[in-house]
Amino acid sequence: MLERKKTLNVFRDARDAYGSYDDFPVGQPGVDPMPHLSRNRMAQPFFQVSEADQVLIQMAGRGEIEFRDARMTLEPGDTIYIPACTPSRLHPHGEVVQLRLKAEPAVREAVAFYCACGAIVASTEVAAGIVQDAYLAAVHAFNASARTCTCGAVHPLVELGDTAWDRVAAALR
């Protein structure tokens, strides 16, 4: 089971990840920025937006990070600065291990679902705190909605894949 500690062995601890996009805080409370560990195997279900800058470190595996108007390839060792309020979405090519450095104390985030035309189909603001509950609620709300863009495109249901946000949130309480 993942836990907060003073030292971190990323590769050993990643084996204990609950599922994709855990964003499990692995540092001691009060560490700023706080490292959040994820082992991802599927495309991120939404674009993630934070009101504070973040840094993403690609520890293992390959993939891409998608911004609104660009994509970048991610290779082991890559470090990506994500400016505040910049929507980004991760697309692993197989299994990846990533550390995301987030502000501590936590700040507001949002999740957004975009259409290929560029319009926002839906978005949800996420209060600071245990964000995994809000991630899960946002996907359920999106799936329960009409999922129709202003351009007329109807978006498919979002698959949760191997995410385990309910278990991560329970572990953080």
Describe each model-derived feature in a short phrase.
Residues 120-126, 154-157:
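Short functional micro-motifs and their immediate structural scaffolds
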Residues 110-121, 128-131:
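Flexible, surface-exposed loop/linker segments and immediately adjacent secondary-structure boundaries
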Residues 93-112:
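A short hydrophobic beta-strand segment most commonly corresponding to one strand
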Residues 19, 41, 48-50, 73, ...:
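Short solvent-exposed loop/turn micro-motifs enriched in small/polar/acidic residues
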Residues 1-39, 43-46, 137-173:
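A short, N-terminal "cap"/entry segment at the start of jelly-roll beta-barrel domains
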Residues 74-94, 103:
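Conserved metal-binding segment of the jelly-roll/cupin
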Residues 49-78:
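A short beta-strand-loop-beta hairpin characteristic of the jelly-roll/cupin
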Residues 56, 110-115, 146-149:
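Cys/His-enriched microdomains
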